[in-house]
Amino acid sequence: MKIKVGILGASGYAGNELVRILLNHPKVEISYLGSSSSVGQNYQDLYPDTPLNLCFENKNLDELELDLLFLATPHEFSAKLLNENLLKKMKIIDLSADFRLKNPKDYELWYKFTHPNQELLQNAIYGLCELYKEEIKKASLVANPGCYTTCSILSLYPLFKEKIIDFNSVIIDAKSGVSGAGRSAKVENLFCEVNENIKAYGLASHRHTPEIEEHLSYVAKEKITLQFTPHLVPMQRGILISAYANLKENLQEQDIRDIYTKYYQNNKFIRLLPPQSLPQTRWVKSSNFADINFSIDQRTKRVIVLGAIDNLIKGAAGQAVQNMNLMFDFDEDEGLKFFANL
């Protein structure tokens, strides 16, 4: 028997990827597409290549008969929308940032709004499957992680867990394709602005910084502060991070490989690449995989970790479906058994 799901925000890039994945999921039926601006429009008019013959509606959510609702909406939307009564009717996976951070003051500092739903904020489960699998299985509200956050935490988690690095020495240099900026029209995202151009943005102010710090602090069991700098590169999709950290002791590469293997050998979507094989975005394009590798610079006594994901799949829609699978006791990779599309 299939579960009935709805999507708010299916017109965006992450929302469209969510539709594409769910259409091929054997245990899901897409029953509702919510929109306030596109009511009556058929989804195929918006995305002719997507075989979903369903029109956008604008119903009161309390009227819906759904097992699960995905929210692929702008920040601050779901914080105002969700309530305990709705969560008694259906499960929620929120792809926005509205329930990712536990400290309400972080929303005032980083997102410039006062969180109106602090009780739900404390009850939401952070949907990074590789760290919080058991909690996700029992959750009614899951906060889907950010794209940079997913790649950064997965790349560094074993090092923090084993406490083999100086936590406050960590620097993360991240690069993302333009789809990470969303589908809305912005001058800085026009073809002539991004083509043949690489630029940094969000210097010392990117909103994924507190998210990365919060969950790596939880792993480390102490508050950590790190440096995170994102860059926009002229490609559609993909994230590559290069992370640097000082080693606490004299370790060899096999020592660190053993640590990563210990934590990731049974994970379906994390691929620790062979030595000398460095992650590339094209190897994970349109897939739910995270590719990771590392090297030690014996001269500087630093470990350099590389991670690559597709920002729209493992960094958004694919991870949301992975969370759904856990919440409904499906196989974790159900509907996600596809590889890179070169």
From Swiss-Prot:
Full protein name: N-acetyl-gamma-glutamyl-phosphate reductase
NCBIfam families noted in UniProt: argC (TIGR01850)
A Pfam family reported for this protein in Swiss-Prot or TrEMBL: Semialdhyde_dh
Places the protein is found: Cytoplasm
Enzyme Commission designation: 1.2.1.38
A molecular function GO annotation: NADP+ binding
GO cellular component: cytoplasm
Classification lineage: Bacteria, Pseudomonadati, Campylobacterota, Epsilonproteobacteria, Campylobacterales
Catalytic activity annotation: N-acetyl-L-glutamate 5-semialdehyde + phosphate + NADP(+) = N-acetyl-L-glutamyl 5-phosphate + NADPH + H(+)
Active-site residues, record numbering mapped to chain: C147
Top-level taxon of origin: Bacteria
Family: Belongs to the NAGSA dehydrogenase family. Type 1 subfamily.
Primary site of residence: cytoplasm
Functional description taken from the UniProt entry: Catalyzes the NADPH-dependent reduction of N-acetyl-5-glutamyl phosphate to yield N-acetyl-L-glutamate 5-semialdehyde.
Class of the enzyme per the UniProt entry, highest EC level: oxidoreductase
Pathway listed: Amino-acid biosynthesis; L-arginine biosynthesis; N(2)-acetyl-L-ornithine from L-glutamate: step 3/4
Matches recorded under SUPFAM superfamilies: Glyceraldehyde-3-phosphate dehydrogenase-like, C-terminal domain, NAD(P)-binding Rossmann-fold domains
GO biological process terms on file: L-arginine biosynthetic process
Gene source species: Campylobacter jejuni subsp. doylei (strain ATCC BAA-1458 / RM4099 / 269.97)
Keywords assigned: Amino-acid biosynthesis, Arginine biosynthesis, Cytoplasm, NADP, Oxidoreductase
